[in-house]
Amino acid sequence: VGNKVYKIDVSTGKLEKSFGTKGFIESFTLVAPLIYKKKLIIVSPDSISTFDVENGKFLSEKVLNHPEKNFLRGAIWGGIALDRKNGIVFANTGNPQPGNYGVHRPGINHYSCSVLAYDLNSEKILWSFQDVAHDLWDFDIASPPILHDLEIEDKVFEVVISLTKTGNTLILDRNTGKPIFDIEYKRAPSSDLIGDFAYPFQIFLNTPERFSKIEFGHEDYNKLSKAKIHEIKEYLKNAKFGWFETHEFLLSII
């Protein structure tokens, strides 16, 4: 609630006054906390913290701050999942800020638009996998990760699955972060804005088939009335269309 996490006795509905400061600890989170062994796991937008589940004592914090990091956000807000057997927390992260202008945040913007695996025992990030490098399109991963045991040709893979705004279904090995299926890297358009940078390659999945597309064309509204089609074409006559199309001064991108 607000910037506090409370501990409530479910049998009485009252605060556990022995926890933290009279029943609460100061911590802000956008997702529900988890419990692993005797650790309370709280994920804030930019860190993963653990507390003693009995008394609320602070135990550890991992700030998602890579040496390359030169941007705001990349927040954990879409949800987390806990692999109790292996003691790993999986989290999906948001997009870097400023969102549509990347001049002051060159590089891939590590840990943004990514799936992260955090080892609760070693208190280290095991791996990360990025869906969109140097995001300029608000392609944060807005869904929680899903844990699943996937059987392929009589072999079982422990996987984490993330559905992304780009239409990708990322299926990754929980322990290594490696994709279960081959991933293609395709060349993406460069930026026309002076000083801006668009990452030259983005991932493209063939398996599983994308469940939606980010490309848009005139054929996508060809079942409307002639008058409406003409109206839309006029509105979009100066717009740019394409896969990971970049921004241009005074032009819209679709």
Predicted regions and their residues:
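Aromatic (tryptophan-biased) beta-strands that constitute blades/sheets of beta-rich domains
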Residues: K14-S27, K57-H66, K124-A133, P179-I254
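Phosphate/diphosphate-binding loops
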Residues: P144-L193
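Repeat-blade elements of multi-bladed beta-propeller folds
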Residues: V1-V5, F28-I48, L72-H104, N109, ...
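Beta-propeller blade signature
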Residues: G2, K7-T12, S47-G56, I108-E123, ...
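Conserved structural-core and active-site-/substrate-pathway-adjacent residues in large, well-folded domains
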Residues: F19, G56-L59, I80, V115, ...
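Active-site glycine- and acidic-residue-rich loops that bind
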Residues: N65-R73
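Short, solvent-exposed loop/turn and secondary-structure capping segments
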Residues: D9-V10, S18, V53, E61-V63, ...
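Loop/turn elements at helix/coil->beta-strand transitions in domains of secreted/extracellular proteins
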Residues: G87-I88, S122-I125, F157, K178
